[in-house]
Swiss-Prot record:
Main location: cytoplasm
Subcellular location: Cytoplasm
Pfam families in the record: FBPase, FBPase_C
Originating species: Picosynechococcus sp. (strain ATCC 27264 / PCC 7002 / PR-6)
GO biological process: fructose 1,6-bisphosphate metabolic process; fructose 6-phosphate metabolic process; fructose metabolic process; gluconeogenesis; reductive pentose-phosphate cycle; sucrose biosynthetic process
Residues at which substrate binds: D132, G133, S134, S135, N224, Y252, K282
Protein name (Swiss-Prot/TrEMBL): Fructose-1,6-bisphosphatase class 1
Cofactor mode of binding and number, as noted: Binds 2 magnesium ions per subunit.
EC number(s) on file: 3.1.3.11
Length: 349
């Protein structure tokens, strides 16, 4: 007689404790009060947006009007890809009429998107990069979404969202969704870093790894060396050091989430420094580097601008950029040492 119980236990979807994202968030918050349930519900909506984007990406090459550019530019002066626009609209759609967030701010919008009917009760703001690394979409390489949740402070009657211009320690939660061989969601609410994999058979993000911890040192450095001659001497000296010393290897995909995920899991350093012409760098603080810095430090790593802790940096406007160094403590401190040495030489110390 067939053992149906054994068939069930051998099911691929049931080969581990199926801890879902919403259950895990509530466990981490150790509460079932209204605030905890709000954060859990927001995370569920973010997960829904990730599922919708992942579905679109999986069929992008088979559908018309998905790949390529829209012909428009965003507030950053960058050409907008169709997937950028689609993913941005997805995040807005899943939070409309949710009662959970009052504002959404993203790379694709000059000003925050307000949901007035949510504002009396949804005292949260979602900041996000809907598709990071969108240049990879057309060639079927990894891309991701980055998100940060902040508590709204004050009434924001002027609609200028000035309360968002605070340091990264003010984040309530942050994370990213990586669209790769599997779709993975990584998040932290200040109690460690945890990863979830989307199980297509269940339609749920299932806990894959809890309390991810980075090694203090890693062999990987991730940087766009095509910018070598645009960097300050300190960064060029650091790269030359990497080239001269054995035990280091370069990995760079052009997708921040993919490169950062490798560093998070294996150790090493990701850097996107400023250039001589643009010392502020390329990456935006509030919805790109601050959320990732939050994750890195929660996992035991270090996040820096090169001259100060990245999470201490206070922006003066919504889309402010900052030089970025993220990774294992020893690797980040090595980069910082080159910058500090250059500063000492400049002042003659």
């Amino acid at each position: 007689m067939p053992d149906h119980n054994n068939d069930i236990t051998q099911s691929p979807s049931l080969d581990r404790d199926c801890t879902t994202l919403s259950r895990h968030v509530l466990q981490q918050l150790q509460s079932f009060d209204t605030a905890a349930q709000d954060i859990s519900a927001i995370m569920n909506r973010i997960a829904l947006a990730g599922k919708l984007v992942a579905r679109r990406l999986s069929r992008a090459g088979l559908m018309e009007g998905v790949l390529g550019f829209t012909g428009e530019e965003n507030v950053q002066g960058e050409s907008v890809k169709r997937m950028d626009l689609y993913a941005n609209d997805v995040f807005i759609s899943v939070f409309k009429q949710s009662g959970l967030v009052c504002r959404l701010a993203s790379e694709e919008m000059e000003k925050p998107y307000y949901i007035p009917e949510n504002c009396p009760i949804g005292r949260y703001t979602l900041l996000y990069d809907p598709i990071d690394g969108s240049s990879n979409v057309d060639i079927n390489l990894n891309v991701g979404s980055i998100f940060s949740i902040r508590q709204q402070e004050g009434m924001d009657l002027d609609g200028d969202a000035a309360d968002l211009l605070q340091n990264g320690h003010k984040q309530i939660a942050a994370g990213y969704i990586l669209y790769g061989p599997s779709t993975m969601l990584v998040y932290s609410i200040g109690t460690g870093v945890h990863s979830f994999i989307l199980d297509p058979s269940l339609g749920e993000f299932i806990l894959a790894e809890e309390n991810i911890t980075m090694p203090n040192h890693g062999s990987i450095y991730s940087v766009n060396e095509g910018n070598f001659w645009q960097w300050e001497d300190s960064i060029r000296d650091y790269i030359r050091y990497m080239h001269r010393h054995e035990g280091y290897t370069a990995r760079y995909s052009g997708a921040l989430v993919g490169d950062l995920h490798r560093i998070l899991m294996q150790g090493g350093v990701f850097l996107y420094p400023g250039t001589k012409k643009k010392p502020e760098g390329k990456l935006r603080l509030l919805y790109e580097t601050a959320p990732l810095a939050w994750l890195i430090e929660q996992a035991g790593g270090k996040a820096s601008t090169g001259t100060m802790p990245l999470l201490d940096f206070v922006p003066t406007y919504l889309h402010q950029r900052t030089p970025t160094i993220l990774g294992s403590v020893e690797n980040v401190e090595l980069v910082e040492s080159f910058i500090q040495e250059a500063e000492r030489e400049t002042v003659g110390v």
